[in-house]
Amino acid sequence: MKQYNYPIVKTLLDTDAYKFYMQQAVFYHYKNVDVVAEFICRGPNILGCYSHILLDQINMMSSLSLSHEEYLYMTTFPFFKKEYLHWLKKFRYNITQVKVDNYHGQLHIRISGLWKEVILWEVPILSLISEIFHRHCYPEITSNIAVQHLNKKLKEFFKKNRDVDLSRLKIVDFGTRRRFSYDVQYSIIKRLKDTFPFLIGSSNYHISRILKLLPVGTQAHEWFQAHQQISSNLRNSQTLALKTWLSQYNQHLSIALTDCITMDSFLRDFNLFFSKSYQGIRHDSGDPVKWGEKAIEHYERLGIDPTTKTLLFSDNLNFRKMISLYKKFNNRVNIIFGIGTKLTCDIPNVKPLNIVIKLVKCNGKPVAKLSDSPGKTFCLDRNFIKSLCKAFDLSLTV
């Protein structure tokens, strides 16, 4: 098995934008909150054999820090505050927070510590697992092969949609976590930037910086999950998460994720104030057409013109699904498409990993994600799921 005497992750910025956005909010509001996160492989892959290589790479991450040039780049964004950026400049990964084991062939990872520190581990660890796995299983694959396949997809896309008005089409790279490799992600996004006028940005801060793209992201499920134990009242946890985000960012970064406790419960909390204050909402599970119709109906019921709002679709998209949703909604609401694995690990005969790292505890107590797709629901404590369902008036079948 290939050994690495160099770090695969070479910069603190090689991660998703929403990690910095959430980290800043945690820094100002929840400095002393501690969390536990665990790795989950949703597929049949046996990944434990890579544990020692992964651990070597994690150890190398302890030397990463924000360079002066990167720090100056971060200061160009109005939503980052000086105190946070000064702290981030001194930030170092604490490798004692991460436990990695090969348990009978299964890869076990547990990350624990202060939320403001633990929050940055998820994306690089997932991208490391993905790259180590793919380089071992597909050593013949190069970034040139990935770009050649992308070129074929783009040619087919333009041919099939030559009669479609694409003037409102916007896509964003969301592919860091499950990329084939960093080189493939960079090459794919550079090619899109050069040849695909509908690319507006990337979730990867490093790639956005060097390719001069807009970094895009808001918050992840963990933001809402942690509030389940931060809030003194479980039923008000989602509302507190939405309020705290607005207090930190106001009109910036105001796209809200809807499916931590199902879309229906989210909309019950997403009242007129939130619906006006947030620029839009993000789809990450469940039927995207039903979700989009429900979102538009919600805005209309509150007397809000949907064309002033944005729907961001980001659940397992490819070009075919994207254009179908675009045709359905583009004249009724602003839409953005976040495409991940189908950009950065879409290579013939390569099967991407289906891996995640999710919060399991906050302040020593369980948290849950009750998705609109049953396969994405996650919690280690069945009793807490019952409490959450009772608080939000949900069926236990979610």
Curated annotation (Swiss-Prot):
Lineage: Bacteria, Pseudomonadati, Pseudomonadota, Gammaproteobacteria, Enterobacterales
Record keywords, A-Z: Ligase, Phosphoprotein, Pyridine nucleotide biosynthesis
Role summary: Catalyzes the synthesis of beta-nicotinate D-ribonucleotide from nicotinate and 5-phospho-D-ribose 1-phosphate at the expense of ATP.
Gene Ontology CC, one term: cytosol
Phosphohistidine found at: 221
Biological process per Gene Ontology, one example term: NAD biosynthetic process via the salvage pathway
Listed EC numbers: 6.3.4.21
Enzyme class: ligase
Molecular function, one GO term: nicotinate phosphoribosyltransferase activity
UniProt xrefs under HAMAP family: NAPRTase
Reactions catalysed according to its record: nicotinate + 5-phospho-alpha-D-ribose 1-diphosphate + ATP + H2O = nicotinate beta-D-ribonucleotide + ADP + phosphate + diphosphate
Modification note: Transiently phosphorylated on a His residue during the reaction cycle. Phosphorylation strongly increases the affinity for substrates and increases the rate of nicotinate D-ribonucleotide production. Dephosphorylation regenerates the low-affinity form of the enzyme, leading to product release.
Name of this chain's protein: Nicotinate phosphoribosyltransferase
Pfam families from the UniProt entry: NAPRTase, NAPRTase_N
Coiled-coil region(s): none
